């Protein structure tokens, strides 16, 4: 009677002899703990998953669902893992681990291109482990390194992503990224990690220790990878180049975001209104429109903003700071966008043209205001008397009639006015 299969493990394509060898090695890898679902599951990041073809994706889904079903049938799994729930709903498996992947981004940057190229070239097959063979204890075959040969420069190759290593210890350490193994524990804080170096790095969060200091600007960092990334600001190094247009970037994540301009891909969709974005950060900010959340509040006047950058820009109104200076005329501005618009004055550039009368404007906001002349639209209405205006500034000026506010004082005689134009007219009396 043939053995009944219990666990199917997807792995990179190999010859029958190699498959048989891996099967034997797998049986020798029996450990002292019961089989858990994580022992026979494989995680993919979004980038890795998108490199698989339809057949490979289907095989992965079938094997994962079969493995879980078999574990349940012999009483080895009581709760349903999140990845199984996603697969049963027809969703992508990498969604369950997005936050983990994001957290490892700095460590995996150098692996990004190697993984993608390797996964595009490789195919999956299955190793079948029977109930009788396995007893009740196994470990994934991916943890079994290949035999080292003297002729190979980097003999230790990861069968999941194709990355190669000079040393067995590096290879084993790398495998824990795929399998989520965490052998190193920070006893003081009760958190586990896949590498000893990550324990040290985590402890620095609590101690505040930042041993990596930039000699250029003095800024300090808790881990070497963040320090290396920071140094690119000073060196101008941009190692990640777009093969489509040649534009280069400091970080792998920035290249990935940029490439979506060429592909038109917008994977982050708002479930409220359906609007899609190329970056998760853009979606995160967009959601605040629906929730009304404005977490960044000005301590000076209480005005709140959806973005931190908007708060910083606003605060310059109180401080009078204008860090963006025009090199052509010396005029300074409180925001980069205002300086960009100002540059168009020198260039004579007017990008925004009215289709009704062909009048052109430097800024889009000026065009929008101008178009209200043609449409007679007056969106700014006074709550006090109902009078409407085509500009927000006109409404503000009008409301001072009701409030009696006169913020513009004459320095010569102290008389106050409700609008700047009235003050300028008055000052003409003193100058003659």
From Swiss-Prot:
Where's the KRAB domain?
35-106
Where is the protein localized?
Answer: Nucleus
**Zinc finger extent (C2H2-type):** 156-178, 184-206, 212-234, 240-262, 268-290, 296-318, 324-346, 352-374, 380-402, 408-430
Keywords attached to this Swiss-Prot or TrEMBL record, sorted alphabetically, are: DNA-binding, Metal-binding, Nucleus, Repeat, Transcription, Transcription regulation, Zinc, Zinc-finger
Source domain of life is Eukaryota
Q: What is its main location?
A: nucleus
Q: Which GO terms describe its cellular component?
A: nucleus
Q: Report a single Gene Ontology molecular function.
A: DNA-binding transcription factor activity, RNA polymerase II-specific
Any single GO BP term: regulation of transcription by RNA polymerase II
Task: State a single Pfam family of this protein.
Answer: KRAB
User: Any idea what job this protein has?
Assistant: May be involved in transcriptional regulation.
Which family does this protein fall into?
Answer: Belongs to the krueppel C2H2-type zinc-finger protein family.
Protein's name in the database: Zinc finger protein 829
């Amino acid at each position: 009677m043939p053995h009944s299969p219990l666990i199917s493990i997807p792995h990179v394509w190999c010859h029958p002899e190699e498959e048989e060898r891996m099967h034997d090695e797998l049986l020798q890898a029996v450990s002292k703990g019961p089989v858990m679902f994580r022992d026979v599951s494989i995680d993919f990041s979004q980038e890795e998953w998108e490199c698989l073809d339809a057949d490979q994706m289907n095989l992965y889904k079938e094997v994962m669902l079969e493995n879980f079903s078999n574990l349940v049938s012999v009483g080895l799994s009581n709760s349903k893992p999140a990845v199984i729930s996603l697969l049963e709903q027809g969703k992508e498996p990498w969604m369950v681990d997005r936050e983990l992947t994001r957290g490892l981004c700095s460590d995996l940057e150098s692996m990004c291109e190697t993984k993608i190229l390797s996964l595009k070239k490789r195919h999956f097959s299955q190793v079948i482990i029977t109930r009788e063979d396995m007893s009740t204890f196994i470990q994934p075959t991916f943890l079994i390194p290949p035999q080292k040969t003297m002729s190979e420069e980097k003999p230790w190759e990861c069968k999941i992503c194709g990355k190669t290593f000079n040393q067995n210890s590096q290879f084993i350490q790398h495998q824990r990224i795929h399998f989520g193994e965490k052998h190193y524990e920070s006893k003081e804080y009760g958190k586990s990690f896949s590498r000893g170096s990550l324990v040290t790095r985590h402890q620095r969060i609590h101690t505040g220790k930042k041993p990596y200091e930039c000699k250029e600007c003095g800024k300090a960092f808790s881990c070497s990878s963040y320090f290396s990334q920071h140094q690119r600001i000073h060196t101008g190094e941009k190692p990640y180049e777009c093969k489509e247009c040649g534009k280069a970037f400091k970080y792998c994540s920035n290249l990935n975001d940029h490439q979506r301009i060429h592909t038109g891909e917008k994977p982050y969709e708002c479930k409220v209104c359906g609007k899609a974005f190329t970056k998760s950060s853009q979606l995160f900010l967009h959601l605040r429109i629906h929730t009304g959340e404005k977490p960044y509040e000005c301590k000076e006047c209480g005005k709140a903003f959806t973005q931190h950058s908007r708060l910083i820009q606003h605060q310059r109104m109180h401080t009078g700071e204008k860090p963006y200076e025009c090199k052509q005329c010396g005029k300074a501005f409180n925001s980069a966008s205002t300086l960009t618009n100002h540059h168009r004055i020198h260039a004579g550039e007017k990008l925004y043209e009215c289709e009704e009368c062909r009048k052109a404007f430097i800024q889009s906001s000026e065009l929008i205001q101008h178009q209200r002349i043609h449409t007679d639209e007056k969106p700014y209405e006074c709550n006090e008397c109902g009078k409407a205006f085509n500009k927000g500034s006109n409404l503000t000026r009008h409301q001072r009639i009701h409030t009696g506010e006169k913020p513009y004082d004459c320095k010569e005689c102290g008389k106050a006015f409700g609008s700047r134009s009235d003050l300028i007219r008055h000052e003409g009396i003193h100058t003659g």
